[in-house]
Amino acid sequence: MDAGESVRQSLLKEFEDSIKDIWAPPAGQKLGGSEEPFFQRQQRGRHCGMHALNNILGGNFVTPTDMMEAAKAYLSEQGHGTGDELEDLVEKDGNYSIEALASVLRDKGYSLDLSEPAATSLERAKGFLQHRPESTTGSHHWIAYRYCAGAIWRLDSLMERPEQITPEELAKELSENRTFAIQRPAHG
């Protein structure tokens, strides 16, 4: 192994070790091996942002109604009406803006820092939400990443099941598209 490969392996090991204690399995689940350890919602309509949040949170916690109410609350907080601006946050077919996703997460007790994608405090990270401007469908798409049961998982609502990936694949994918850390509620 050359010096560059040794450094790369060392960095990957450090990254893997750092996330092992950060991301926890969903409450009550104790699994091992490559068994799929949690909930994954497949896409219906263009609700990929909502599905990605539910995949990170581990259940059907966010509904289309929640998304609409969160978007309206966001507009109200920003001093806007709910006309055309609402369609910018929640399209009729279910495509959601990052502002709407952040607002619904706040309503559920989580946070998403819009100014610092994926660079926020990892010790409270529940998972990662990633925006992919061009997907296989030719439109915008949201996917999720979680660390669970000793493995890193890519949760894409267009896919039939979660896909286990390596720390190297995660690091590469996080650098390719805008990615946000979903933060757990702070306790204290």
Segments from the language model and where they lie:
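Short, surface-exposed coil-to-beta transition loops
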Residues: 137-142
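Conserved active-site-adjacent core of cysteine acyl-enzyme catalytic domains
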Residues: 78-135, 146-148
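Amphipathic alpha-helical interface elements that mediate macromolecular binding in regulatory proteins
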Residues: 46, 50-54, 99, 103, ...
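Eukaryotic basic, amphipathic alpha-helical target segments in cytosolic regions
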Residues: 56, 60-61, 109-113, 136, ...
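Conserved beta-strand elements of beta-rich interaction domains across eukaryotes
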Residues: 45, 55, 134-135, 149-150, ...
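Noncatalytic regulatory segments and standalone regulatory/sensor domains
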Residues: 154-188
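Active-site nucleophile-adjacent alpha helix/oxyanion-hole segment immediately C-terminal to the catalytic cysteine
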Residues: 2-91
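Short hydrophobic/aromatic-rich beta-strand segments that constitute the beta-sheet cores
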Residues: 130, 152-155
